[in-house]
C-alpha cells in the first residue's frame, strides 16, 4: 500500500491506475466526522490522527472512525514536521551535494532545528527540535481507543530508538511505570490544541 501525505496523491493514483491500498498520514487532516467520511469514501485503509488536535478534539475523530469502520492510529512519539521547504537548504547555501544528510539550523530563539534533506526530490523537512511524547499519558490515549499507536523515528540513533521503544512498550503494552529515556520533550497539541 501507499502512505498518502497530500490529498492530491489520490488523483495521481487514479490517473496512474495504481490499485494499491491507500493509508492517510497525519498531514491529510481528518479533523472531524465529515473529513473521516470523505477519507472512507476514498477507500482509506487507515488514517493517522493529525498532530494538531488535542485529546478532546481527537475524541470525535476516533468515534467517527469507529462508526465508519475505518482503523485509525495516533502518533505517540516523534518529531513533528514544522515545515516542508520547496528548496534545498544545502543547495542554496553551498551547492548540491546529492547526499541525503541531517542538517541543523537555528531559529530566532536560538533553538537548533533538525532538517532532513530529501535529495531525490530536492526539498527539506524542518522538524520540531523536541520530540512529541505521550509517554505518561497512557490513560488519556487508551480513552481515545485508537486502533494503533505510531512512534516516528527520524534523527534518533539505534540505541536511542531501542530505549524509546522499550519505554513505550513498558507503559502501553505491559502497563508498567517506566521512565522515558529522554528529559526534553513536548506534548505537542495533545493537552492544548490549535488556537
What are these regions (language model features)?
Residues 1-195:
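Active-site pocket-lining/capping segments in soluble small-molecule metabolic enzymes
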